[in-house]
Amino acid sequence: MRMYETIFITDPDLQDEVRNTLFDRFKGILEQEGGILANFDDWGNKKLAYEIAKKPRGHYVCMTYGGTGTLVTELERNFRLDDKILKYMTILLEKDIDPEALKLQIDAEAAAKSEADAAKAEADAARVEAEAKKAETDETDETVDAETPENEEEN
């Protein structure tokens, strides 16, 4: 098994639902051909270096996966046949990888990401709570100031 990276550019005018269906189709081809998806990174809309099909922008996507040459051939055949794909490019990252090691690496990265997301959510919750307490304290101070009469100078 080899490790590949494919970057493809889709039509930026596609609706999210159509784009997600397209992504699911490519992921399905990858699974059907026995590939292992390591990373699917949606880069979003970006300006193209030059117009493609009279479009100055494109929606970029990067897929990193393990598979065989037949998988790459099948993916690229589907890219060529689909009018929604403006450009694509596949490069070979590693010639020989262990599929089990790749699966373990993917699982470890997913676990690390979920831990990081949980820590971030915890930190956000603590920050919101601290801001709420501070706002409550500020309101209490303003109420106390409003209730106390101002001291007048005595002559």
UniProtKB/Swiss-Prot annotation:
Keyword list, A-Z: Ribonucleoprotein, Ribosomal protein, RNA-binding, rRNA-binding
Domain of life: Bacteria
Any GO BP annotation: translation
Gene3D superfamilies named in the record: 3.30.70.60
An MF annotation (GO) of this entry: structural constituent of ribosome
One Gene Ontology cellular component annotation held by this UniProt entry: cytosolic small ribosomal subunit
The family this protein is said to belong to: Belongs to the bacterial ribosomal protein bS6 family.
Designated name of the protein: Small ribosomal subunit protein bS6
Lineage: Bacteria, Pseudomonadati, Thermodesulfobacteriota, Desulfobacteria, Desulfobacterales
